[in-house]
Amino acid sequence: MEHPSTNYTPEQQHEKLKHYILIPRHLWCYIKYGTHVRYYTTQNVFRVGGFVLQNPYEAVIKNEVKTAIRLQNSFNTKAKGHVTWTVPYDDISKLYAKPDAIMLTIQENVEKALHALNQNVLTLAAKIR
């Protein structure tokens, strides 16, 4: 059963993708359990996604085995409205993941180091003149 699509304006999509990182396709298989993802289908339909339940996941779809990502809308499997669904990698054009605290710390440290490096380059350039 396919979930009915909710249409989001480009502005709403942009807002929902704040703090999410576009993941290159060759790294999709490394997105771990519990990570929240959002994605665009190959038909360019924006989906708000869910939490990774299994990834990669070998799904049989129309008698064909496909590599997929299995998602859920919550961690409480007994909660009313809890659903899981499978999305084959081939049906995804763009996949975004919400980084955890470790990744945010790494990103912040890299940005600080890059800023310091840029300052050093500017200082050296000024001395050369």
From Swiss-Prot:
Primary subcellular site in the record, as a coarse category: virion
Record localization: Virion
Broad class of enzyme this protein falls into: hydrolase
Keywords carried by this UniProt record: Host-virus interaction, Hydrolase, Inhibition of host innate immune response by virus, Inhibition of host interferon signaling pathway by virus, Interferon antiviral system evasion, Viral immunoevasion, Virion
GO BP of this protein: symbiont-mediated suppression of host innate immune response; symbiont-mediated suppression of host type I interferon-mediated signaling pathway
Enzyme Commission number(s) of this protein: 3.1.4.-
Gene Ontology molecular function: any one: hydrolase activity
Keyword Hydrolase: yes
Family: Belongs to the asfivirus C129R family.
Protein's job: Plays a role in the inhibition of type I interferon signaling pathway. Mechanistically, specifically interacts with 2',3'-cGAMP and cleaves it via its phosphodiesterase activity. In turn, prevents 2',3'-cGAMP interaction with host ER-resident STING1 leading to inhibition of downstream signaling pathway and type I interferon production.
Protein name: Uncharacterized protein C129R
Organism this protein belongs to: African swine fever virus (isolate Pig/Kenya/KEN-50/1950) (ASFV)
